[in-house]
């Protein structure tokens, strides 16, 4: 292990002891914001310090066994102990290196997941519905909570656009690599000749702002329109102007919400989605600046970037960013995304490790 890494781990061990002391103080526990911030830091540091303690134990075991080498009757035992201790040190050292990688500050946030039908008309809208079901099934497997924020249904089923809020542990960290273009190749239900059609949807995964105030929105920059909610095909489903459209004039971002009968609730939801979209836009602008110096294999999360192809006749999914092909499309469409997400996270970690190596 590098001296710089060991020094960092020693600092974290000291910091954890400080946090234990702080969290037992009454003036800290009475300040909810401060207490929440410190408990979050404590939860992050705990596993790292625990791993480091195991690494030091393995190092001490190796040192103790080294002393036994001088005794001929103990040499075989000592060599085996040294080998086992060094194996543990290597394994724990690699895990610690990953644990020390810079954390995305948004990783623990809830998300807004937005799916938009793209090229392909009705078939694209049907695929948007299939993608939504895939993510909802994955959310179910993770025991996450899902709330429908806005939906524009198409005539044949599926969605022209749909936005859901997903709340739960590590929602953003697991789904953040889903942003981009998703292409489908299959025979549509409406196709009589059996020809394979290609259509596409775009997915955007946006971290939820902790509070709307976290993103500065000047009320003077907003135009709020109310209108009558409508269902698929344009038929009116509500006789009051409960639907809300919020336009953020400086960015041109528009959010519509009409899923609730209450205008107040629709406005509240629209403002939450707007805050997330503005935050997402700011993040992408920052990432674009960084991408100018280092191109990420995982990609920029740009919606125009095609990231994945779903080929139904072959039962094949291909993620173009990491050249991964899986022949288990049915299971994936049923929400079994663990293998795919693990591969993307692993590639991202490898990139971060490589960039840290370059920095050294």
From Swiss-Prot:
Q: Which UniProt keywords apply?
A: Cytoplasm, Methylation, Protein biosynthesis
SMART domains linked: PCRF (SM00937)
Subcellular location(s): the record lists: Cytoplasm
Description of post-translational modifications: Methylated by PrmC. Methylation increases the termination efficiency of RF1.
Instruction: List GO molecular-function terms, semicolon-separated.
Output: translation release factor activity, codon specific
One Gene Ontology term, aspect cellular component: cytoplasm
Basic and acidic residues: which segments have biased composition?
280-293
Q: What is this protein called?
A: Peptide chain release factor 1
- Would you identify the family this protein belongs to, as annotated? Belongs to the prokaryotic/mitochondrial release factor family.
* SUPFAM superfamilies attached to this UniProt entry: Release factor
Chief location of this protein? cytoplasm
Job description of the protein: Peptide chain release factor 1 directs the termination of translation in response to the peptide chain termination codons UAG and UAA.
In this chain, the stretch annotated as Disordered covers 280-300
Task: Give a single Pfam family match.
Answer: RF-1
HAMAP family, from UniProt?
A: Rel_fac_1
Residues recorded as bearing N5-methylglutamine in the entry: 235
Organism, scientific name: Paraburkholderia xenovorans (strain LB400)
Transmembrane as a keyword of this entry, yes or no, is no
